[in-house]
Amino acid sequence: MNLIFMHDVEGELVAVNPEYVTFVETDIYEGKHVTMIYFTNYKFAVTESFETVVNALNGWRKRT
């Protein structure tokens, strides 16, 4: 399993399992631009840019 590590809006490092990501979009959370990562049953916001998240997911898909 290849995890991608990103920072959530609290500044904590979180592990994202790309295999279960269903949707990614930009949003505003507490006045800050964030990237929302959606999974089957939940979602969370990370501070990395949309482009960074998409590139990481695409890089993972090319390796698998």
Regions found by a protein language model. Name each.
Residues 2-14, 19-64:
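Acidic, Ser/Thr- and proline-rich intrinsically disordered linker/docking segments
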